[in-house]
From Swiss-Prot:
Single GO cellular component term: plasma membrane
Taxonomic lineage of the native organism: Bacteria, Pseudomonadati, Pseudomonadota, Gammaproteobacteria, Enterobacterales
Topology versus the membrane: Multi-pass membrane protein
Pfam families linked to this entry: Virul_fac_BrkB
Statement: the UniProt record of this protein carries the keyword Cell membrane: yes
PANTHER family per the UniProt record, alphabetical: INNER MEMBRANE PROTEIN YHJD, UPF0761 MEMBRANE PROTEIN YIHY
Transmembrane segments: 44-64, 104-124, 140-160, 183-203, 210-230, 244-264
Gene this chain is encoded by: yihY
Coiled coil start-end: none
UniProt name for this protein: UPF0761 membrane protein YihY
Alphabetized UniProt keyword annotations: Cell inner membrane, Cell membrane, Membrane, Transmembrane, Transmembrane helix
Subcellular location: Cell inner membrane
Highest taxon in the source lineage: Bacteria
Family listed: Belongs to the UPF0761 family.
Principal location listed in the UniProt entry: membrane
Length: 290
């Protein structure tokens, strides 16, 4: 009986081990860590223009004035762990200065933000090894839609959650609402990664693969926030060495780590589909053998 159980265990772990080997092979071939470093560099250059464009969109809609403040706190609290207050002050100063720019400068900000979208598009399609190229107009429309509708949808979701909390008739549901809001960052990350892995690649991505890859990326992202904040708190070596400038390497390391998670989720999504195809091909060869 023990021998049978051992054989069944080996039978179930063998596909998992083969999939992990395939995942590691793809990560190595795609130079994932180098690609994450490139995206981190582009992201840091595009961070202020991107935030400036997003907040300018909220300024154009007075109904989102209160939500804009909530969204700022939500972004800096959930996407920039540790030293988020310092980074928030610097970025808001940069954004305030960008409001004094001319129309040409504003167009430059928009172009810089769109270049970040293009870099993300190129990186993900390189992982999917897609040779299909979208028309330029279509790509611009997709980038602009993400740049405009993304923040507005996030603001609308925050407005709805605030409205639910303000309802007196929902006092009996406060515990349920609190639990939902507690996992809201995880759900938002999961949905965001799922949309990223589903929409950006120029080839069809199986929905279940995108869901699994997005869920793993969301879990790693939330765990990474907690772990990174704990590391900064327990081992403040950056602050001892760099002093006031410690926020710069901390921000860079966090952005780099974030892109490693995003690309790892993409690699997982791709590998799930690729492993399934390889397994089907192997089974087909076995069936064709006499």
């Amino acid at each position: 009986m023990l021998k049978t159980i051992h054989e069944k265990a080996r039978h179930h772990t063998r596909p998992l081990w083969a999939w992990l080997k395939l995942l590691w092979q793809r990560i190595d071939e795609d130079n994932m860590t180098t690609l994450a470093g490139n995206l981190a560099y582009v992201s840091l250059l595009s961070l202020v223009p991107l935030v400036a464009v997003v907040f300018a969109l909220f300024a154009a809609f007075p109904m989102f004035s209160d939500v804009s403040i909530q969204l700022r706190h939500f972004i800096f609290a959930n996407f920039l762990p540790a030293t988020g207050d310092v980074i928030q002050q610097y970025i808001e100063q940069f954004v305030a200065n960008s409001n004094k720019m001319t129309a040409v400068g504003a167009c430059g900000l928009i172009v810089t933000a769109l270049l970040l979208m293009y870099s993300i598009d190129s990186a993900l399609n390189a992982i999917w090894r897609s040779k299909r190229v979208r028309p330029k107009i279509y790509s611009f429309a997709v980038y602009w839609m993400i740049l405009t509708l993304g923040p507005l949808l996030a603001g609308a979701s925050l407005a709805i959650s605030s409205y639910l909390l303000s309802l007196r008739w929902a006092s009996d549901l406060n515990t349920v609402i609190d639990n939902v809001l507690r996992i809201f960052p995880l759900l938002l990350s999961w949905i965001s990664f799922w949309l990223l892995y589903s929409i950006v690649p120029t080839i069809r991505v199986p929905n279940r693969d995108a869901i699994v890859g997005a869920f793993v990326a969301a879990l790693l992202f939330e765990a990474g926030k907690k772990g990174f904040a704990l590391y900064i708190t327990m081992f403040p070596s950056y602050q001892l060495i760099y002093g006031v400038l410690a926020v710069i390497p901390i921000l860079f390391v966090w952005v780099y780590w974030t892109w490693c998670i995003v690309l790892l989720g993409a690699e997982i999504t791709v590998t799930l589909g690729e492993y399934r195809k390889l397994k089907q091909a192997a089974e087909q060869e076995e069936d064709d053998e006499p």
